[in-house]
């Protein structure tokens, strides 16, 4: 048994949910708490976990509570509407309406901390909410080396050639396998239903390829720092995300 209460802002853009578990049983099934008063079509960020939910999902399915450890556990969840994602989706949708294509590649790029991952995930949810098949692809799987080895290579280049040499390495074909990711975008535009994607881990040997089903997918979202590079081909709509150091 649980007791739960919530408050929602007048604009329906913020919600705070408090839950107390009154009774707990061994091997208890996952408990969901359904919210009320949200915008069904909006996407909300749960601030502590960083997970995203549509308003409809929060109101109809609810948010799962963590596995219990004792009775009278208390939880609190804070939700914030991702308004920037909604605004971006409206603009992207207008562009798509003006440029009718069977398949569209949208690149979201910007510096570290600019919100690429958060916005891309929310944008994907907006497309899915409208019944549009959308796949989110991370460009972080396409350097030549795993992160640890790439950091070592950056240091080697800097020690041997200084800042000029490092500028000639970062984000270029020397660091990034642009040919590989360009093949992915080309295959998507060609209408292929199965495309080989690359997956990169953090340790030696953790680079693999996987056949991925793209049937029913009409929008490919590419989220990547280098998504605006001249060496990247096949992007229909580039979206640059600008952020200040404070942000």
Residue ranges and their predicted role:
Residues 83-107:
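Extreme N-terminal, non-catalytic leader segments
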